[in-house]
Amino acid sequence: MLFRSNTLTEVLCAAGIREYAVSETQKYGHVTYFWNGNRSGKVDETLEVYEEIPSDVIPFEQAPAMKSKEITEKMVENMASGKFRFLRCNYPNGDMVGHTGVMEAVVYAMECVDSGLKAILEAADKYGYTVLITADHGNADQMTETKKGKTSVRTAHSLNPVPFIIYDKDNEWIIKEGAYGLANVAPTIVKMMGLTAPECWEASMV
């Protein structure tokens, strides 16, 4: 498969920015291969560090925390190191546990993600980072559906809009009114970092 050019990683590497990416096996490809436009390997070996945390081979509803604790620890550790200007992670819990349809497990899974995000935000305050929080689709947000008057468990992805949250204790960022999608995330990131976006990109949200 041909990879797509003008990815965010290419722009960051061209600017000499060091990056860190982490997730567990279930979503590792989403912060590496898919993130880089279907590119196997790194754009620049000297600037990028990828870390995969092996997922447990167990039904997700039996271990809904998944590897959220380990992902959080790796993020905080690398934020504290000061080695990276741009870091990214993916928590698979809402999607993978959401597919099981087991409500109690889904609630606990999202509590684990909440706990992880709390630690990352605290680290951002301590080490001077801005945090962006978003998703590529929903699942855990809609666990039931009603058809012909009958309510049943829903295990598929939802079609609800996803959030885009900017957390920055030192700066105020205003998201402009508009209809946005994932294609607007990279332009927003480079603008916030003071970089120039490729002309082929969509508009920044700020």
Task: Indicate where each model-derived feature is located.
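Feature captures the catalytic ectodomains and active-site-proximal regions of enzymes
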Residues: 1-206
